[in-house]
């Protein structure tokens, strides 16, 4: 699992930042999954809106968060010289882009 490998990487003083990135990414994956479940339960849009009247605002915030993570991973990919870390960050970037795309797909189905 890419998150497990990232959590084991030692990046000196930035290991705390890396752990924060992993936590945020896991949170985004859970959010993506909840959007997917709402889509699967068709007609759950009303329930989603009732449960969280500000769900569009929350969705916007999650997209900002994932864009920030994507940029952060791209930056780390550029500055990393270790090939193992480069591969790990490339895989993380691919996973982030997939999660972002799935969130977009689910959100368009809910709107």
Curated annotation (Swiss-Prot):
Protein name: Nuclear export protein
InterPro entries, alphabetized: Flu_NS2
Motif Nuclear export signal in this chain: 2-11, 75-84
Subunit structure: Binds M1 protein. May interact with human nucleoporin RAB/HRB and exportin XPO1/CRM1.
Pfam families: Flu_NS2
Additional facts recorded: Average number present in a viral particle is estimated to be 130-200 molecules.
Gene coding for it: NS
Biological role stated in the UniProt entry: Mediates the nuclear export of encapsidated genomic RNAs (ribonucleoproteins, RNPs). Acts as an adapter between viral RNPs complexes and the nuclear export machinery of the cell. Possesses no intrinsic RNA-binding activity, but includes a C-terminal M1-binding domain. This domain is believed to allow recognition of RNPs to which the M1 protein is bound.
Family statement drawn from the similarity comment of this UniProt entry: Belongs to the influenza viruses NEP family.
Keywords: Host nucleus, Host-virus interaction, Transport, Virion
Localization per Swiss-Prot or TrEMBL: Virion; Host nucleus
GO cellular component: host cell nucleus; virion component
Any one of the GO BP annotations: exit of virus from host cell nucleus through nuclear pore
């Amino acid at each position: 699992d890419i998150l497990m490998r990232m959590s084991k990487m030692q990046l000196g003083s930035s290991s705390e930042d890396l752990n924060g990135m992993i936590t945020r990414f896991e949170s985004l994956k859970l959010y993506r999954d909840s959007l997917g479940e709402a889509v699967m339960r068709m007609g759950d849009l009303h329930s989603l809106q009732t449960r969280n009247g500000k769900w569009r605002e929350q969705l916007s915030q999650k997209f900002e968060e994932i864009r920030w993570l994507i940029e952060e991973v791209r930056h780390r990919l550029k500055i990393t010289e270790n090939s193992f870390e480069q591969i790990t960050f490339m895989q993380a970037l691919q996973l982030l882009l997939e999660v972002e795309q799935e969130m977009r797909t689910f959100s368009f189905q809910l709107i």
